A protein has these predicted regions:
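Short gly/ser-rich loop at a beta-strand->alpha-helix junction or flexible surface loop bordering the NTP-binding
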Residues: 1-249, 399-409
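Surface segments flanking catalytic/ligand-binding clefts of nucleic-acid enzymes
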Residues: 161-165, 174-409
Length: 409
C-alpha cells in the first residue's frame, strides 16, 4: 500500500476541504501560464514505464491530492517503483511506522497520523522548527500553498460564491469581508476556548465539523492562511511521543521536546511565533512565562456590544485572572478604515470591562531589539519575572528569535 510521506503528507493535511473534495478537468489549467502547461502535461501524459503508484498519483492529482505539489513524496508498494519520476519522489518507509496507525484515503492510499508525521518531519529540523509546525497542527489555522489545480478550483468556487451573493441581495452591496476572519460574520474556528476556559468542540449548527474558511483582509484580499479546526492537541502529541521514547523510536525525544513547546489554539503564524519566544524554556532562549489561553472568548456586556461591533471577541493571548490580553497584529490587520474601527471598538469595550489590552505588530517582532524592549515592558505589566539577560542567555535568545522569524510555514 502506498503511503504519503513527509512534506507531501503535511500538504495533504493543509489542503482545504473545499479543494480536497473537488475534481478538475485538466484542460482548465491551460490558462496561458508556463505553470499551467507544465501541470497539464503531468496530469495527462503517462510517465515512461508508469507503474500503479505513479498512475494513481497522476489521476488523483486532479482530485483529492490536488493540494499537494508535484512531484510528491510517496512510500510505494512495489520495489520496482523506487525510481523517481515527474510525479513521484519515492521514499523508504520509516522503520518506526506502525501500519495500524495509518489513515486510509481510499483506493489503497494511506497517510500517517499527525503524530506519526511529525516523527518523519523531525529529521533535518530543529526543535524550534518542529514546534512551530506542531503549533499549526494544534492551532486554528493552516498555511496552504496553492498548486495550479487548487488555484483553479478556488477561483471557480469564488465565482460561485459571488453569484450566490448577487442572487441573495440583488447587487454588489454587502460583499465587504465576504470570506475572512476579520469580517463581522458568524465565526468559523476563530476561538479555541469558551468564556469559562472550556475547550470548544468546533462543530457547526448541524453537529458536523466546522468548515474551512480562507483568511482575507476586510477588503477581500486573499491570503495563504485558512481557518480550520485543530488536527490534534499538545497533550495528545506529548502522550504519543512519551510512549515512543519508551519504545526507543528514533527522533521521538526531539519530537517530545518540540511538543512541550506547543500551546493549543494559535490562530496565525505570528501567534505561534510569539508563543515560542515567550513560553519556551530559558534553556532554549525563551522567557518561560506562565502560559495563557490562546484565543479564549470574552463576552461583552450588553451595553458595550454596539461599541465592540459584536457580542464577544476572541483574545489572542489571555490571562483571565490578570485581565490582560496581548494582541498579535499582522501586516494586514488594519487593512482599511472598517477594520480599524472594528478593532478599536473591540479594544475600548474590553478596557471598559477592566481588561488591559497590549499589542505587538509583526514589524516590531521582526526587529530583535524592539521585540526585547516590548516583551520586557509586557512582563512588567503582567508581573512576570523575566529571565536574567546574561550574555549566555542573550546569545540563546537571539538564536531562538532568528529561528522563529526565519521559519516559513
Amino acid at each position: 500500500m502506498p503511503v504519503l510521506h513527509g512534506m507531501s503528507a503535511l500538504s495533504y493535511y493543509r489542503t482545504p476541504l473545499q479543494v480536497e473534495r473537488s475534481e478538475i478537468d485538466p484542460s482548465v489549467l491551460l490558462d496561458g501560464t508556463e505553470e499551467g502547461k507544465r501541470v497539464y502535461r503531468l496530469l495527462t501524459e503517462p510517465c515512461p514505464h508508469e507503474n500503479s503508484s505513479t498512475r494513481m498519483v497522476r489521476l488523483r492529482a486532479r482530485g483529492d491530492l490536488m493540494g499537494i505539489p508535484l512531484p510528491l513524496e510517496l512510500c510505494p508498494t512495489e520495489p520496482c517503483s523506487m525510481r523517481p519520476n515527474r510525479l513521484v519522489i519515492p521514499r523508504r518507509p520509516p522503520r518506526h511506522q506502525n501500519p495500524a496507525e495509518l489513515v486510509s484515503l481510499g483506493g489503497g492510499l494511506m497517510v500517517p497520523t499527525v503524530p506519526q508525521l511529525f516523527l518523519e518531519l523531525a529529521r533535518g529540523r530543529t526543535i524550534v522548527e518542529l514546534g512551530l509546525l506542531m503549533m499549526e497542527a494544534c492551532g486554528l489555522f493552516a498555511v496552504f500553498h496553492e498548486t495550479a489545480q487548487a488555484r483553479a478550483v478556488l477561483k471557480t468556487l469564488r465565482v460561485v460564491e459571488e453569484e450566490r451573493a448577487l442572487e441573495k441581495i440583488g447587487g454588489w452591496e454587502g460583499r465587504s469581508g465576504s470570506g475572512g476572519f476579520a469580517a463581522n460574520r458568524k465565526p468559523y474556528c476563530n476561538a479555541c476556548y469558551d468564556e469559562s476556559g472550556k475547550r470548544l468542540f468546533f462543530l457547526d449548527d448541524c453537529g458536523g465539523a466546522q468548515p474551512w474558511r480562507r483568511a482575507t483582509t476586510t477588503i477581500g484580499k486573499a491570503t495563504d492562511m485558512w481557518a480550520r479546526p485543530p488536527l490534534t492537541t499538545a497533550n495528545e502529541l506529548i502522550d504519543y511521543y512519551s510512549r515512543c521514547v519508551e519504545r526507543g523510536i528514533p527522533a521521538a525525544r526531539k519530537a517530545l521536546q518540540a511538543a512541550k513547546l506547543v500551546l493549543d489554539g494559535a490562530a496565525s503564524p505570528l501567534e505561534a511565533r510569539f508563543a515560542i519566544m515567550q513560553f519556551a524554556p530559558v534553556s532554549l532562549g525563551g522567557d518561560a512565562w506562565p502560559r495563557p489561553f490562546l484565543n479564549r472568548r470574552v463576552r461583552f456586556l450588553p451595553e458595550l456590544r454596539k461599541l465592540a461591533g459584536r457580542d464577544w471577541c476572541s483574545c489572542d493571548e489571555l490571562w483571565d485572572d490578570l485581565k490582560v490580553d496581548i494582541e498579535l497584529n499582522g501586516r494586514a490587520f488594519h487593512a482599511d478604515e472598517r477594520g480599524f474601527s472594528l478593532e478599536s471598538g473591540r479594544r475600548a469595550a474590553l478596557e471598559a470591562m477592566g481588561y488591559r489590552v497590549l499589542e505587538i505588530t509583526r514589524g516590531q517582532m521582526e526587529d530583535y531589539d524592539s521585540f526585547e524592549t516590548i516583551s520586557l515592558s509586557f512582563a512588567d505589566v503582567l508581573g512576570f519575572r523575566e529571565a536574567p539577560r546574561t550574555s549566555a542567555f542573550c546569545k540563546r535568545r537571539k538564536e531562538l528569535h532568528r529561528q522563529v522569524m526565519a521559519f516559513r510555514f
